[in-house]
Amino acid sequence: MNQNITKAILPLAALSCVHGKMLAQDAARPNILYIMCDDHAMQAISAYGSPISKLAPTPNIDRLAQRGMLFRNCFVENSLSTPSRACLMTGLYSHQNGQRQLAEGIDTTKTFVPELMQKAGYETGIVGKWHMMCRPKGFDYYYILDGQGKYYNPNFCTTGNYGKYKQEMGYATTLTTQHAIEFLDHRQKDKPFCLYVHHKAPHRSWFAEPKHIGMYDGVDFPLPKTFWDNYENRGSAAKTQKMNIEKDMELILDFKIPELLDTSDVESMASYAGLMGELGRMTAAQRMAWDKYYMPRNRRFIEAKLSGKDLAVWKYQNYIRDYMSVIASVDESVGQLMDYLKAHDLDKNTVVIYTSDQGFYMGEHGWFDKRFMYEESLHTPLIISYPGHIKEGVENTDMVQNIDFAPTFLAYAGVQQPKEMTGKPLQPLLAGNKPKNWRKDLYYHYYDYPTYHLVRKHDGVRNDRYKLIYFYGKGGMRAVEENKYQKIPGTSEYNCLKYLNATHYFNDDADVSYYELYDLQNDPDELNNIYGKKGTEKVTKQLMKRLNDYRKELKIEEY
């Protein structure tokens, strides 16, 4: 055995299982295969048992759940892609690592977890979506997409050639899987590996792989019971958002109907440009497969002249059909990676983690997208398998958060958790030994306003029964004055701001400052804000104290 690895292992037996310490382990440290999708909702994984997934199963992800532990209460600290990735890389909350919003850059002076894994003797790699405003740090190997990346024939850059992107022919999920396998094929066999496989899918606008286009045509997915939510009994944020399927999903871009282009309308032109950003990359064969399904479907839609609730239901059905068709490729990828591990005798000593950067709305409250502290976007799927160390087919309902992922990686590597990380390693839960001091509540904070979807800034605290949310901040153009990054010419956020102004997207948003309180036991769908109602004084006081404790402890300076 390599002497460096031996030196790292010998002290482990002396370490306790308390927060920040490594659990005693067997002689060899495990490999880590971390698979993360973008916007994969729990509702879209059949192991979680939702009505949608019963009609569109995910057998390979389910197989992973059968081999390990499925977490039902995994939450994010900021339900937005790049901030979630920054949290994964640093183990820090958004305000601590600098990546509070999409356009802000992570503080690169912070230590990245892969750097610590490297120092501990791991070979590190990342393939697929990086989407951070910096070079990958701490990776021996990277093969990453250009920004958000495209589904069809995307651009990648490779180790030592950061920023020099080259187009590759194929589908993003398939290519990402292939590059993951290339890493595994060429890794140093005398080292444990830590590989991050980050899929673009199923991010908006849901372009399926050619073989899966239209695979759910004719399948009628059940409407969520809150689909027709009118947002009564809640504050203004739920009403002023721009993520409603009926009103805000774009027929041209999201539903892929270029025939509806209106060259006199700026929104129509922008939507068409977004669609052509994918269609224009397709090969003749890919476009033929796409046209075969979408052209007749679009013709039927235009002829039907739907409106009102009929149009809303059509949008919902086709949104879910496209989304789940994209998930089919992700599920196949998980199966291919699991099969590879088994075929190469790596399955017994590899921790496999499956998750998403955050949750997603699949029609609940009539919505798509994420951002809110409400349950569907606050939750994220988490499944962990480690044969012989984690019991098979078990479920966990303890409260875990994505700030726990970094400490978990480090614990497996035998690296002491840095003091600035406030998350907890998951090993005790995975072993069935919940510590007495395990968290009883958690803190959440969303910062990215004003931008697309117009979800207002808010933070909050959630425990096993109640949730307290505080919405705050200036509205509309008054908020722009506080976001200097949005006014830098040439940046994507500047272009976004120009577009939003041109379409009067947020010119009438009011300033807000109010609380919402939900009893998740009696109101799991969060339809009734009980803040200020008689009988809630005690729980409100308790949650307000916890919220202020978090703000003080974490040094939140937003207010």
Outline where the language-model segments fall.
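Formylglycine-dependent sulfatase
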Residues: N2-I5, A13, G20-L497, T503-E516, ...
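Residues forming the ATP-binding cleft of Hanks-type serine/threonine protein kinase domains
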Residues: Q521
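Acidic, histidine-bearing metal-coordination/catalytic regions of metal-dependent phosphoesterases
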Residues: A8
